[in-house]
Amino acid sequence: MRIDCLPALQDNYIFLLVDVEQRQAAVVDPAEAEPVLAALQAEGLTLTAILNTHHHGDHVGGNRRLLRQFPEAAVSASAVDRDRIPGQTVLLEAGDRLQICGQTAEVLFVPGHTRGHIAYYFPEVAEGNPRGALFCGDTLFAGGCGRLFEGTPAQMLDSLQQLRSLPDDTAIYCAHEYTLNNLRFALTVEPDNFDLQQRYQAVAIARQQGQATIPSRLDIEKATNPFLRWDQAALQAAVSSQDPVQTLARLRSRKDQF
């Protein structure tokens, strides 16, 4: 399975999953249809599946147009979002598995950003890609996490704990190019984190050159993303709490005002 990253809207990424041998593809969080249709046409691919992580318009905005072109494509999303996903045909629960482009995707229930948010975890992808791939929408970002629009800090902590427990070499495919600003914030709460300092410098150069910072990798996030470091003493001191939920809540509140 090949994974292509398609820029969309202002700062979104759409992910096209390609089975080269079968000439088929699936798409994760199509913010808009046009980049997807162009990529499919360029290679003569048939779209067989749409995977939505949550209901926000910049993640489902392309569903209807894609279904007009490929009406047989299955649309998968959380059962919680059954009335909020255009064209949904597959209602997913935690622990469900899907066969996508010859690979198995495991469904993780990760509420917090929204009440129905899910992530798709592929334990194995094709040769040339990392050992696993996580498509996490707006739950986990490179250097950050999503705002709590519908969920609680406790829910988000539980969701991030699930993601943090995946193998360290898991590739993190989040849906927005927020990395540089996220790392700027991270430096305000962990200014002495050497790994974070180094990452910020590398990301700043990459963005100056117009390069994407996605995918990230889980071990990098665990070393530099404050929202996966709620149990680190330096970070707890920065927010004056040793309680994991309160630590995450205070971090999120600070980031909202950053």
From Swiss-Prot:
GO terms for molecular function: hydroxyacylglutathione hydrolase activity; metal ion binding. It catalyses: an S-(2-hydroxyacyl)glutathione + H2O = a 2-hydroxy carboxylate + glutathione + H(+). Binds 2 Zn(2+) ions per subunit. Zn(2+) 2 binds at D58, H59, D138, H176. Its cofactor is Zn(2+). It comes from the Bacteria. The keyword Hydrolase applies. Keywords: Hydrolase, Metal-binding, Zinc. The keyword Metal-binding applies. Pathway: Secondary metabolite metabolism; methylglyoxal degradation; (R)-lactate from methylglyoxal: step 2/2. PANTHER family: HYDROXYACYLGLUTATHIONE HYDROLASE (PTHR43705), HYDROXYACYLGLUTATHIONE HYDROLASE GLOB (PTHR43705:SF1). Thiolesterase that catalyzes the hydrolysis of S-D-lactoyl-glutathione to form glutathione and D-lactic acid. This is Hydroxyacylglutathione hydrolase. The gene is gloB.
